[in-house]
């Protein structure tokens, strides 16, 4: 029986494909390219799970665009960035997690500029760090926190480099459009203040704004002891 499930070649019993099936020989390890399925480089249609639809749902595996069962992509056990193709995992810095998070479709890692070394160089631009995830080797330059800078914030000086800079502030200072939560960094801006969108509501006395942070309690964001008690205010993550 051939890999199209046809006995004696590809007749009308081959899902209606007829002779255009290209013979569907078992030597291709799956469906022959003439079947409209996997080519011989794919390693067989058995590698094309329905969970791979859209080339971005492979879980711990990696979607490789060059070996697809149309309209789905094949998942491979580990992320081999060299096989992910231009604009895909290859521009994520080469880590397994980086590739998995970015997927292989245009607009993922490509939106970071596709520069070597990961998405950290995107500087927090739209569709940047948040899209790539945030583990060492992928978006590690974004701080390495789970979810990436875009999702979990950049309140530490090591979190977002390069980062947006507001006028009069040091190069490592995050601007509101750069990182979330919108926090100034202790190395470049004073006071150590978080904007209202940085902290969750606190149990503060009336008259204290949520943008008020205490320098000694910068991580997580806290209300200043001079205006509120209790002092704690968790950062939004």
Curated annotation (Swiss-Prot):
Q: In which tissues is it expressed?
A: Restricted to hair root, not detected in any other tissues.
Q: Which family does it belong to?
A: Belongs to the KRTAP type 5 family.
Q: How does it assemble?
A: Interacts with hair keratins.
Which regions does the record annotate with the repeat sequence? 62-65, 68-71, 74-77, 159-162, 178-181, 188-191, 198-201, 227-230
Query: Any idea which UniProt keywords this protein has?
Result: Keratin, Repeat
Its recorded name reads Keratin-associated protein 5-5
Biological source species: Homo sapiens (Human)
- Give the residue ranges for region: 8 X 4 AA repeats of C-C-X-P: 62-230
Question: Which residues pair up as cystines?
Answer: none
- Gene name of the encoded protein: KRTAP5-5
Write out the function statement from the record. Answer: In the hair cortex, hair keratin intermediate filaments are embedded in an interfilamentous matrix, consisting of hair keratin-associated protein (KRTAP), which are essential for the formation of a rigid and resistant hair shaft through their extensive disulfide bond cross-linking with abundant cysteine residues of hair keratins. The matrix proteins include the high-sulfur and high-glycine-tyrosine keratins.
**What Gene Ontology cellular-component terms does the record carry?**
cytosol; intermediate filament
């Amino acid at each position: 029986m051939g890999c199209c499930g046809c006995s004696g070649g590809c007749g009308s019993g081959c899902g209606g494909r007829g002779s255009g099936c290209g013979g569907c020989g078992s030597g291709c390890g799956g469906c022959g390219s003439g079947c409209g399925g996997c080519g011989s480089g794919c390693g067989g249609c058995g590698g094309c799970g329905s969970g791979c639809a859209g080339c971005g749902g492979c879980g711990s595996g990696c979607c490789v665009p060059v070996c697809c069962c149309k309209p789905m992509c094949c998942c491979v056990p580990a992320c081999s960035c060299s096989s992910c193709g231009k604009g895909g995992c290859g521009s994520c810095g080469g880590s397994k997690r980086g590739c998995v998070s970015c997927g292989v479709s245009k607009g993922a890692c490509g939106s970071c500029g596709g520069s070597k070394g990961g998405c950290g160089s995107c500087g927090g631009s739209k569709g940047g760090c948040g899209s790539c995830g945030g583990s060492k080797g992928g978006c590690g330059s974004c701080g390495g926190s789970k979810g990436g800078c875009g999702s979990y914030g950049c309140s530490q000086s090591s979190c977002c480099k390069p980062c947006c800079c507001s006028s009069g502030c040091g190069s490592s200072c995050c601007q509101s459009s750069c990182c979330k939560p919108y926090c100034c960094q202790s190395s470049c801006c004073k006071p150590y203040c978080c904007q209202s969108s940085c902290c969750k509501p606190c149990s503060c006395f009336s008259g204290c704004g949520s943008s008020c942070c205490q320098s000694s309690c910068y991580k997580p964001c806290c209300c200043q002891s001079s205006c509120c008690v209790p002092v704690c205010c968790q950062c939004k993550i």
